[in-house]
Structures are given as structure tokens and as C-alpha cells.
Amino acid sequence: MMRLLLLLFSINAFAHISSGVDVFFQEKKYESLNGKRIAILTNHTGVNSKMRSTIELFLEHANEYEVVALFSPEHGIQGQHYAAESIDHSHENKIPVYSLHGKTRRPTPEMLEGIDVIVYDMQCTGVRAYTYPTALFYIMEEASKHNIEVIVLDRPNPIGGLTVDGPMLEDKWRSYIGYINVPYCHGMTIGELASFFNEEYNIKCDLQVIPMKGWKRSMSYRDTGLAWIPPSPNIPEPDTPLFSSSTGILGELGILNIGIGFTLPFKIVGAPWIKAKEFAEKLNGQKLPGVFFQPFYFRPFFGLYKGLDCEGILIQITDPKIYRPLSVQYLLLGMLKSLYPKEFLKRLETTSGKDLFCKANGTDAVYEILLKEKYAVWKLIEIHQEERKAFLEKRKKYLIPSYN
């Protein structure tokens, strides 16, 4: 018992910010729900700074309102399901849990019947290609049709609020893993994204965002003092999102092992046909800011190249504030093509992962440049540069002032 008390004290003592759910209950904003029937879209990451479940908090204060439904995203309400796994409806605390990653990804009229308010509280990864924000956007679209209020309890962007990098989303590649036209790394919180989506896409949802207190755009997740709960099985640490923003898309090609199936998800890139020392030396010779590439040797336990000796690199981020995730991705791809053209292009041309790769990128330009351009790196870096500049201007009015 004493150990548990010490743990809870230490978590609370080092929390430097208050997340949206903290603010909601500290300031008794739940009183605005009196007389209403509410639903909550959340999962295991929905906790306050003392590690108390968002569901538990809403139920504890449900004297004048009623929690009538829960919605769960990819990986399920407890986070134990695999990526892309179809999940059935269930019950939690005798409340129906409607899965939005099973037979339907949108709440049906039957699910929404009698609901006055839907609350969203989940930790995402700070990149466009992640299904949790899309689950919210689908909720907002359906809520607008049924005159249901949506409350978003804001949370930190684990990549920070200053990194804006990567391609925009072209309409052709709009999908559940990338639904709105923002850069791959957008530098916005989920609350800011919700406001952006509501206005830019003319959703007209009755939206309320509960901002955090104390969070600043320059913060890393560790700076917040909040405990990190892995939002999905392969995002185990608070710095993993920064690595996954560089290598996650590479994994969709199905030709490189990116640490899925090993102990370092998203932090390594390798294959049996790569020479580690040569690859690392050429990458480091480009002197990208904030990163060092260490030669690395490994044998995956499962997944791509299971049981085979692989060589590649371990990404060491030396300065997160100047690290450019997509520049790293493009350098990795361009250097692989330059050093191992036969092996790389043969696999690129025949991969079954082209569609997922383009959906994650939000464009097929990356794939086409890799296929056709002899010197691909700088062509890749130039993708959507002007569009990103325009986005930086457009997003300004949606940024929460207290975060600056």
C-alpha cells in the first residue's frame, strides 16, 4: 500500500501541466452536463495526471447526468488489440462499448440515439497517419447531423508543437489513416486539429475544446511530467512518436524491418541486403541536423525477415528541437536506392504495400520519385514545400494562445 501511495505521489508531484481532463474536473466543468445523456470516445490512454481513468471520473461525478455509451477506437478500449484488428462491441461497467474499428467506423444513428454530448479523450501520436484523430473527425461529422455536442479534452502533441514537416494530403489518398489535409507532422494538439477540421471542412459541429494548462509548444512529452501510456502496442515510450514519424511510413512498403518484431520499434531500419557500416557512413556524411546513424545488427523475433540476420542503422536523435523527421525518411530512402539500386528497386516495384505507403504519405509523389529519379533525396524534400508554408499561415487562427 505504501509503495502505491509513493508511486501516485511521485506521478502527481512531477506533473508540470494539467491535461484537458484535469482541467475539466478541477474547474467543475462537468456541471454543464447536468440533465444530459453523454457518451465518451476514449481508451486506456484517457487518464488524468493522477492516473485515474477518464471513464471512472465521469462515472464518479454522474449525479446529475448519465453516461449511456462508450466508443472505442483501433486497439480497443483497453489497448490490447493488434493494429487493424476488427473489434466487436462489448460492455464496460455495464455500459455498452461501441467499437469504431469493427463492422463500422462511424457511429450509426442507432448508437447515437438519445445522446446529447460526446466527450473525446485519447492520446495520439502527433502525425496525420494515425486513426485516433480520424475516429474523432467521424464522430464530429455524425454529431453535426444529429445536433450532438462534442467536447474534446486536449492533450499534448508528443512530437511538440513546433515541428511541421512532410507532405500534405491529396484528396486521392484520403482514407481512415489520413483524413484531413495537414502535413504529416502538423505540430497541433488534438483540440486544435478538431477546431481546424470543424471550420476548414465546414462541419458545423457544436464543438467545445477544453485546453490544457501549462503546456507549451516547445515542450517534449517528458517535459510535461505526465506519465506516458502507450497509445498502441508499438509506441512504448514518449519519444517513440518522433521515431515513428521518420520510419513508420517505410514499414508500409514491406521491404524494410523498422524494429517491429524486435525490441526497438521504429528506431531501427534494416534488411538482410543492407551493409550496416557502409549505410551509416553515407547517411552521417549528409550531416542532417539533430541525428546520428549508428550501424546496427539484429535478428527479428517475428514479422518481416523473422530469424534472418539483418544489418542497418539505429537512429540516435541528438537534438529533438532541430530534428526533421521526414528529411530523415527521405534520406534513408534515397540512400538505399543509391547504395543498393538492384535490391531496392526490385522490391519497390513488386511490393504489395504501395497503396498503404501512398495513403500514409498522403501522396504518390514519394513513390514515383523513388521509382523514376536517379537522385531522389532533394526531389523528395521539395514535395509540398509551398503548400506547407500556406498551411503554417492557415493554422495560426486555430492555435490555442496559451500554448505559445
Each PLM stretch: what is its role?
Residues 124-136:
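Glycine/threonine-rich flexible loop motifs
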Residues 83-115, 127:
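Glycine-rich oxoanion-binding loops at beta->alpha junctions
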Residues 2-13:
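Sec-dependent N-terminal signal peptides
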Residues 270-383:
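Conserved functional hotspot residues or short segments at active or partner-binding sites
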Residues 215-296, 300-305:
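Glycine-rich, aromatic-lined ligand/substrate-binding cores of catalytic
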Residues 78-83, 151-173:
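Glycine-rich, charge-decorated loop segments at or immediately adjacent to ligand/cofactor-binding or catalytic sites
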Residues 66-74, 153:
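Short internal beta-strands
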Residues 174-246:
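Conserved anion/nucleotide-ligand pocket segment
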